[in-house]
Amino acid sequence: MNDPVFAAPEERVLPTLNNDGTRRWLNPKRSKGRFLKWRALVGWGLIAVFVALPWIRIGGRPAIWLNLPGREFTFFGKVLLSTDTLILMLGMLAIFVTIFLLTALLGRVWCGWGCPQTVYMEFLYRPVEQALERWAKAGRGSTRKAVAPIIKYGLFLAFSVVLAHTFLAYFVSTDALRVWMTQSPFEHPGPFFVMTATVGLMMFDFAYFREQMCTVICPYARLQSALLDRDSMIVGFDEKRGEPRGKGAVKEIRKGVTERQYGDCIDCGACVKTCPTGIDIRDGLQLECIGCAQCVDACDAIMVQIGAPTGLVRYTSQRNLETGLASRLLRARTLLYPAVLLGLLLALALVVSNTTGLQMELIRNPGAPFTVIEDGRVQSPVRLRIANRDASKEMYTIAVLESDVEMLAPINPFPVLPNETDSTTLFLTTSADTFVGGNRTITVRVESSSGQVDERRFQLLGPMR
């Protein structure tokens, strides 16, 4: 009995690598066309929004402020605390389902049109680099060639500093950022280190790592096999129309030959030369394709030149390429995802509408959780954080419901400005005999001057009995 014969798999390396494993540096040609124009408008619009949002004030707060040290998050005037776990969970789930839906419908449109990696690289860093390269080649002698890299990396550094500061503003607010920028780094070494590290990472990414962020690091490309289906929008090459490839196609097209030897693809390589990740779109759907449509603009320009119809490379679907049939809009994914998304948004709206203007949080004070004072009783410092989500200043009366617990508050009632969060320390004193197994539970009640009430249970730590 003959042993089975297995075909050896076709060897293939990443498009950013040479066959010997060394890196293949890409310098994609910029192909002008209708999609590049639209992408530029979208890209610069997103950059403008990204830079402007931290400076826009709604209710006295930044439009978006992810205050991680303060454990609060502001979204267009709405303040969420770390205790708003249900709201945060529903919001994150809604974002994920939206990504699933958009991917099922539009493929990797986010990667090619909205991802910061693509937007900054293709509309900020790379255009400057290519403009300086043209300037250096146009000059005589070696002066321009020597100066161009210095100018390039100087501009790259300036871009990275601006983007890094803008990025940090989302986490620290522009008020803190403005203070840090006008002071010596020695007065705030921690934030200065974070900013420097962020600038360094951006320089490394956009000056060196580049497309490898999309093809090697980013997990979204690897998710597309699960998120895409045969009807999802992709950038594809019409093999039935384009094959077999050959330069002879030009003569056949221009002469109007009926019985043709070649397809419409003249094998010019324009689609490969313009691809920012270095792939050949004619090889079919690939992990590295970001759906930017640069190959579409490049191929359309060639088709116009030789007098052939455009669309040899186009936004399409696997179903359309294989069968010629139109993509199906209504299918299991596109029906299930909107239904789930609608349910999540309704639940989110319900939870948000039931959120009161008062929210409190009890936090264990850093350091020793309790001390035994002279009379033998146990005193526990507890941090109380109050968020005033109303549009007016509120006074909050603080009380402990257990009668055997003595509370000392520095300020009571405690004032909090509108749309602000403030903290105070409560000193709670109780008998050591009330602790069972080293802890006991108390209830803290906070009532606002407008009548809103919130209560929280908290576990005090004490001596073991």
Residue ranges and their predicted role:
Residues L408-D433:
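Intrinsically disordered, low-complexity Pro/Gly/Ser/Thr-rich segments with frequent PxxP/GP/PP motifs
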Residues E402-L408:
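Short, solvent-exposed loop/linker segments at beta-strand-coil boundaries, enriched for Pro/Gly
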Residues S392-V400, R456:
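Short, hydrophobic/aromatic beta-strand segments
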Residues M1-R245, V296, P309-L342:
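Membrane-embedded alpha-helical bundles of multi-pass integral membrane proteins
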Residues S431-R465:
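Terminal connector regions
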Residues L346-F370:
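Hydrophobic alpha-helical transmembrane segments in integral membrane proteins
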Residues A387-S392, S449:
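Short solvent-exposed strand-capping/beta-turn motif centered on an Asx-Ser/Thr pair
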Residues T103-T118, F206-A221, V257-M303:
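Cysteine-centered iron-sulfur cluster-binding motifs in ferredoxin-type domains/subunits
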